[in-house]
């Protein structure tokens, strides 16, 4: 199973670690941590996460595309057309598109939640609806192949 996990400056480490740890128990699990370029990316708590791949050299056909949240850093990333374009491209080919917390906003900006029900931090529900998603108050929302 090939998982692409977006890492970005200021992201909430907990949002990524929980899902990635759970997936690591699956057979044939592989993960690529992606950002503009390989290297250390500092999270919200100051702990560095290693981006193993750039957008250009990441898998084109992941089983799972995953995005965690990060409050203001997530909002800042909404204006990064390269990152949003990467999510749109890989998400259109992924078997599953997944997010935690405000990561749903990034999926929404990439057009990946249009017409889907999706969970997001309660403070971002109105913003999520602007991307054509139907915000859900569920803590975990599954709509077809979208898990938020």
Describe the role of every protein-language-model region.
Residues 113-140:
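A conserved active-site-flanking secondary-structure segment within enzyme catalytic domains
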Residues 70, 102-103, 112, 123:
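Beta-hairpin (beta-strand-turn-beta-strand) motif
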Residues 145-148:
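Conserved anion/nucleotide-ligand pocket segment
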Residues 97-98, 118:
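A short beta-strand/loop micro-motif in the catalytic core of glycosyltransferases
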Residues 1-97, 104-108, 134-137, 141-143:
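Extended, subdomain-level signal for the structured scaffold at the beginning of enzyme domains
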